[in-house]
UniProtKB/Swiss-Prot annotation:
It comes from Danio rerio (Zebrafish). Residues 65-74 have a biased composition (Basic and acidic residues). This is Nucleolar complex protein 3 homolog. It is found in: Nucleus, Nucleolus. One of its GO terms (cellular component) is nucleus. The gene is noc3l. Keywords: Coiled coil, Nucleus. Residues 1-19, 42-53 have a biased composition (Basic residues). It holds the Pfam family CBF.
Length: 800
């Protein structure tokens, strides 16, 4: 007994023994134990489910009657003898018939049950039917199924004995407290039935009163939450419950107000960090009261924020699917207004809370709405995405947005609006790592390798070193500042996804409406493209130009993209893109002469990249040919485009001073100018003159006249023929924007017509002699004496 007990007795493991057991083994043991407990509980639930199913099947099953057995001749004779032995003289005919009917039905009672012979000689089915019927459980009075709570099992000699108890039922008072709104809604539904009919004025007053009460309630809840979010976090649920307003009079307005109020509340109370779920160890650990209160606040905030986003998403889905709810509080016509408010709230949360939880869910919800058929909804979503991409400094939100857009473009087979891809032009990507792959851009490890640890450290030191490295990693993750390496890595990955979108469209959807947006995007990010793709990309762009399937603007974008590629890293490549110069030279005359011409902006960008920035690769004949063609084009353009073209000509004459030969009036040269030739190198531009400047000198726009006079003098930078500072320091693009006629305005303003006032001549002093004029004025100012006349006296009186 002694040795056996010593063998069975487990020794307490030493500290060295515990060190040998790795954390991985301990975690595996814990997982196995939890798996066994879950499997045993799962088996119990499965058996209970089978039992409940069998009982429910029997309760719904109709019982089959017994088969009628054929009577043997002996039984028939006994029944006849029994009927004859009855005292029929003492019974009425009705009683006799009733007894005979009972006797016919009592064949089961009068049959000889001791006989083993089959009732039907040929059929053995009746035996099986009888056995199945007897085995079928009887219908019993069913009790309500009670939910069981599984407790810890008890261990016995035979094994584990599972324990369970019935879940206590909450009293009815608590249920009434949890759902007080339902009774209020029911009362409100019952009141209109008994209420008398109201006039339209009374209905309007009643609605205004209800709406004012709801507004005050929303304001009170919002103010309480903002005053102390940690204490009043439970009021978020009450405010969110008002999203389900059922009063048809004020339902739409109240829901809109609650949506906007919740959006503003969340923007104010959401912390500046992402809330992660607690682990099991953190939940089991004892913490301070303040920490516990903070955890409750964070859990409540995340849950209510999640429910709020789900409500917004469901509102938009109901509007898109035109789904009617059970409660007719909101009609289908009003769902559009509700959905627009919901989309606006989603857009605001996307821009205001890019760091908080469920931001990726908001992106997934919002990106399909960018391609919505409703113009207002699409514009709201696109503007929100542009704001997010412009203000994203790290690049994490931009990467998530670009990935979702890429998936949508591919899933919809490139049938989306161009405005969706135009949003990608707002990406803030200035620096990427083009030499290494995305995996190589990760920061180098600062920790010791396994071989170094094993060589230099003991086992205990390795344990301590491992714990120290783990702590350092956690501290690095907790830092708020983002490293430059991480930023470059995110930007590189984002740019890879963007180029993947562009190259897919160039390869598979060259006739799509997205081609213009793709070419514009390639022109912006061309300096970040890897050198390996340059030859293939230039070949694709030239094939697109020569195919004839592109519009004028798309062909200009192709030219601009190709020169952006060649002006960046393409400087190391010895390529002369003469075919692109020839195409632009040929298509310059197709610029639209009337209306707001937005193609002029792209033309000015092309001239800047092709002639100014590549001045060393451009020949003098090519520059002179473009100068002559641009002056010809300027004759039939609007003032804003004409000013931009003349500013580009000034830039050409200053970059290539020998172009002043076109200002000479010599009639002889080494050939004849061929304006109809499409190749600028061989059209003999040195044998012509810029006679268009004489016509532009008398243009109705004053700025055009200034530029024409300036160019006729050779575009000097100093002297009498130089331009003013306000014109000479601006680029052609800036001048085009400043003098734009897009808003139907004229810059400088047109002078008004001269005033046509009548000239009145005043009469001054007519006499030169001052004394004479004074006497005349004095005589005119004297009042004449009034004399009384007497007509009764004789008119004449004779003198003696």
């Amino acid at each position: 007994m002694g040795p056996a007990s010593k063998r069975n007795k487990k020794k307490r493991p030493s500290f060295r023994k515990l060190l040998k057991t790795s954390n991985l083994k301990l975690e595996n043991k814990l997982k196995n134990r939890q798996f066994k407990q879950q499997s045993s509980a799962k088996k119990q639930r499965k058996e209970q489910r089978k039992l409940h199913k069998a009982i429910s099947d029997v309760s719904h099953q109709t019982l089959k009657p017994l088969e009628r057995y054929k009577k043997r001749p002996e039984d028939e004779e006994e029944e006849e003898e029994f009927l004859e032995s009855l005292p029929t003289d003492m019974m009425d005919e009705d009683d006799l018939e009733h007894i005979r009917a009972i006797a016919q039905k009592a064949s089961f009672l009068t049959r000889d049950l001791s006989s083993c012979a089959p009732v039907h000689a040929k059929k053995h089915k009746s035996e099986q039917a009888l056995e199945n019927y007897e085995k079928m459980p009887r219908k019993m009075q069913q009790e309500e199924e009670k939910e069981l709570i599984h407790l810890l099992p008890i261990k016995d000699k035979s094994g584990l004995i599972p324990q369970s108890m019935e879940k206590p039922v909450l009293p009815q008072a608590e249920e009434e407290e949890e759902e007080p709104n339902q009774e209020v809604y029911l009362q409100k539904e019952e009141e209109p039935e008994s209420a008398p009919l109201l006039t339209p004025q009374e209905q309007f007053e009643q609605r205004a009163q209800k709406l004012m009460e709801k507004k005050l309630r929303i304001a009170a809840l919002s103010s309480a939450i903002l005053a102390d979010p940690h204490v009043n976090i439970k009021k978020l649920k009450e405010l969110r419950a008002m999203l389900m307003e059922t009063d048809p009079c004020v339902a739409v307005t109240v829901r809109k107000l609650v949506m906007v109020s919740l959006m503003e509340v969340f923007k104010d109370i959401v912390p500046a960090y992402r809330i992660r779920p607690l682990t099991e160890e953190e939940k089991a650990a004892k913490v301070k009261k303040e920490t516990l209160q903070l955890r409750e606040f964070e859990e409540g905030l995340v849950s209510q924020y999640k429910f709020y986003l789900e409500e917004l998403e469901q509102t938009v889905k109901d509007w898109k699917q035109k789904k009617e709810k059970r409660s007719q509080a909101v009609s289908l016509q009003s769902y559009k207004g509700l959905a627009e408010v919901a989309v606006r709230c989603i857009c605001e949360l996307l821009v205001a809370l890019p760091h908080f939880n469920f931001h990726n869910n908001i992106i997934v919800m919002l990106v399909p709405l960018m391609n919505d058929s409703d113009k207002k909804v699409s514009e709201m979503c696109c503007e929100a995405v542009k704001k997010l991409l412009k203000q994203d400094k790290v690049g994490q939100a931009s990467l998530a947005m670009v990935k979702v857009i890429s998936g949508m473009v591919k899933s919809r087979n490139y049938r989306i609006k161009p405005v969706v891809l135009n949003c990608l032009l707002c990406l803030r990507i200035k620096e990427v790592d083009m030499k290494k792959d995305t995996e190589d851009t990760a920061p180098k490890k600062k920790f010791m390798s396994f071989k170094e640890k094993r060589k230099n450290l003991s086992r205990m030191q390795r344990k301590w070193k491992k714990a120290e490295e783990k702590l350092q990693k956690e501290l690095l993750e907790a830092e708020a500042t983002e490293s430059k390496e991480k930023k470059i890595k995110l930007h590189t990955e984002t740019l890879n996804v963007v180029f993947l979108i562009y190259f897919r469209i160039l390869k598979k959807a060259q006739k799509s409406v997205l081609l213009s947006s793709v070419l514009e995007g390639l022109a912006k990010f061309a300096h970040l493209i890897n050198l390996e793709f340059f030859d293939d990309l230039l070949a694709v762009l030239y094939n697109l130009i020569t195919s004839g399937d592109l519009t004028y603007r798309e062909s200009l974008h192709c030219i601009l993209t190709s020169f952006h590629i060649l002006s960046g890293q393409g400087d190391v490549l010895n390529i002369d893109p003469l075919k692109f110069y020839s195409h632009l030279y040929r298509t310059l005359l197709t610029l639209h002469a009337g209306g707001v011409n937005e193609d002029t902006v792209i033309v000015l960008q092309c001239l800047d990249v092709m002639l100014s920035k590549r001045r060393k690769q451009v020949t003098l004949q090519r520059a002179q040919a473009f100068l002559k063609r641009l002056n010809t084009v300027a004759l039939h353009l609007l003032p804003d485009s004409c000013v931009g073209i003349l500013a580009a000509n000034r830039m050409l004459m200053q970059t290539f001073p020998k172009c002043d030969i076109l200002l000479d009036n010599e009639t002889q040269g080494s050939g004849v100018y061929l304006p109809e030739l499409d190749v600028p190198e061989y059209c003999n531009p040195q044998n012509t003159a810029l006679w268009e400047l004489h016509l532009l000198k008398s243009h109705y726009h004053p700025v055009v006249r200034k530029f024409a006079a300036h160019l006729m003098k050779g575009a000097p930078s100093e002297g009498s023929g130089a331009l003013g500072v306000e014109l000479s320091r601006r680029s052609p693009l800036q001048l085009f924007e400043d003098y734009s006629v897009k808003d139907m305005s004229f810059n400088p303003p047109v002078a008004g017509p001269p005033s046509k006032k009548k000239e009145y001549f005043t009469i001054g002093h007519a006499f030169l002699h001052s004394e004479l004029s004074r006497q005349i004025d004095a005589a005119l100012q004297e009042e004449p004496e009034q004399m009384s006349l007497d007509f009764t006296s004789p008119h004449t009186q004779q003198e003696p």
